[in-house]
Amino acid sequence: MFKNVFANLQKVGKSLMLPVSVLPIAGILLGIGSAHFNFLPDILSQIMAQTGGSVFSNMPLIFAIGVALGFTNNDGVAALAAVVSYGILIQTLTAVEPIVLHTTIEVIKNKHLSDTGILGGIIAGAISAYMFNKFYRIQLPEYLGFFAGKRFVPIISGLSAILIGVILSLIWPPIGHGIQIFSKWAAYQNPILAFALYGLVERALVPFGLHHIWNVPFQMQIGEYTNSIGQVFHGDIARYMAGDSTAGNLSGGFIFKMYGLPGAALAIWHTSKKENKTKIGSIMISAALTAFLTGITEPIEFSFIIVAPVLYVIHAILAGLSFPLCIFLDMRAGTSFSHGFIDFIVLSGNSHHILLFPIIGILYGLLYYILFYLFIINFNLDTPGRENIKNNILEKDNNEIAPYIITALGGKNNIKNLDACITRLRITVSDISKVKQKDLKNIGAAGIIISGSGIQVVFGTRSENIKTAMDECIKNI
């Protein structure tokens, strides 16, 4: 049972990556536009702010589409059904809640009592995905043949959304009230404790690929800010971009991603065997630069998470502490995606105490370096370079390594589903015993996670391109 739940949660995490992928461009537009830089004409700032803001305002709908696509192998009909479901779901809530709460529609709209936020989008996406998978091959009588098959999906999804909307209108008031209480506590009353918990749990979930689910309420839901033209923004990311001075509580990510983990990478390099230092140095420096520039840290984390889990425990604790540290020092900076130098510079317009970031960051990197160095040496941990290294073939291009990966996964016929997120391949196989983990490691996988018939293979930022190359290779086999 747990394996099935884990597999489904992986699908949820993967499906949430599509909506998240629009955040960088939306965040840059909104962040720069809201900062009102002197070198930008006012009209250009307004255009950037409003276009970026429009994306954040429609995030529930975008999440509905993302969830629908994630559970239906990117079928466009499911996306259309998600749009229909979301619109009907929200309007049903708006119509029924006045009866349930004994108030008027105007009060419902003014107080956002029917605003389900991201959760409403996820529910609508789940409705359309379920209906698609159940009915996309449905046969109808000949006189209704036009509505058979996939054309039936938006219809049944919309009708189902009415029923779900009525049910949701009965249970949403206490749920919404609970979310508001948590939101106020996390964003305004005790952000130090809330974001310490966020940082610790978020890193703990990274090995399982489930951190995207945990990110959503903090990044997209907590807190509320209304700008000068009446646009309402939820979540720490959007509120910061829109100019909310109380947002920016996610700033701790810059400390451990841009400075902490690169310090750990240097420690791994410096503790490697003499004969391996050149190879490990090139790998770790490349991974450190990736973390510093983009905030993508899995290439470093998966270099030690399997062979030295105690180091990952230390890392998760330090990552969790970086968030309350920044909040305590009133250090605020915005991220659109993953806490890298690019985000840090581009979105610096609304930042606070920005010069403290490199100072605290370098100290944090030094702390990481010392702790990792001491633990590796004193406990003789088998981090990369401290054992005999076999040459792998990852230096080949994506098209060349794709056949090797397919073979290591048990061949074309053993692969039931193939997908990828930012740093890892997500695969479902027919027979897990046919998967050759050792071969995947020799190819260059930074980490491998198996649960039931699901397997995640970490190849860093090349994963999406490797997946595309594998798709082409599978078609031609």
UniProtKB/Swiss-Prot annotation:
Signal peptide: none annotated. The modification Phosphocysteine is found at residue 421. The active site is at 421 (phosphocysteine intermediate). One of its GO terms (molecular function) is D-glucose transmembrane transporter activity. Its EC number is 2.7.1.199. The keyword Transport applies. Residues 399-477 form the PTS EIIB type-1 domain. It is found in: Cell inner membrane. Its main location: membrane. One of its GO terms (biological process) is phosphoenolpyruvate-dependent sugar phosphotransferase system. GO terms for cellular component: plasma membrane. It catalyses: N(pros)-phospho-L-histidyl-[protein] + D-glucose(out) = D-glucose 6-phosphate(in) + L-histidyl-[protein]. Keywords: Cell inner membrane, Cell membrane, Kinase, Membrane, Phosphoprotein, Phosphotransferase system, Sugar transport, Transferase, Transmembrane, Transmembrane helix, Transport. Residues 1-388 form the PTS EIIC type-1 domain. SUPFAM superfamilies: Glucose permease domain IIB. The keyword Ribosomal protein does not apply. It holds the Pfam family PTS_EIIC. It comes from the Bacteria. It is an enzyme of class 2 (transferase). The EIIB domain is phosphorylated by phospho-EIIA on a cysteinyl or histidyl residue, depending on the transported sugar. Then, it transfers the phosphoryl group to the sugar substrate concomitantly with the sugar uptake processed by the EIIC domain. The EIIC domain forms the PTS system translocation channel and contains the specific substrate-binding site. The phosphoenolpyruvate-dependent sugar phosphotransferase system (sugar PTS), a major carbohydrate active transport system, catalyzes the phosphorylation of incoming sugar substrates concomitantly with their translocation across the cell membrane. The enzyme II complex composed of PtsG and Crr is involved in glucose transport. This is PTS system glucose-specific EIICB component. It comes from Buchnera aphidicola subsp. Acyrthosiphon pisum (strain APS) (Acyrthosiphon pisum symbiotic bacterium).
